[in-house]
Amino acid sequence: MIQNQIKEQSLKVKMCGMRRKEDIAYANEVKPDAIGYIFFSKSKRYVTGQQARELDQNLDQKILSVGVFVNETIEKVTEIANEVPLDVIQLHGDEDVIYIEQLRQQTDKEIWKAVRVKDTKDIKEAQQLPVDKLLLDTFTEEKDMYGGT
């Protein structure tokens, strides 16, 4: 059973979609494990690398800074990851093993991958990806729906 294969870990909390100074102030108050900046231009919570860098300067250093990317070029991901700078790169699109391996050669940042889960087969396949952490997201039939479910 899949539950037996998952290592016991404590629950982690990430607040995603940080866009305003007030968002960062609230995060500093409630102390999640991580916050996320969305670097997907089709998202209503999109921020630029410059905006994220300015916000991140006020973030409590104990809180991980995560950049969320959807089908972005490796060059752009590493550029933004270094500009902010991010602690973690989260891939939330259709990135495959080859993409992840190439990205890993370009950065020392932790890499997380969000996968849309329809059934346990999706989880088993995702466990084979060369990433540091997996995030399980609700499956949706909408073709270009990434996150926000």
Give the ranges of each region predicted by the language model.
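Conserved N-terminal beta1-alpha1 strand-loop-helix module at the mouth
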Residues: M1-T149
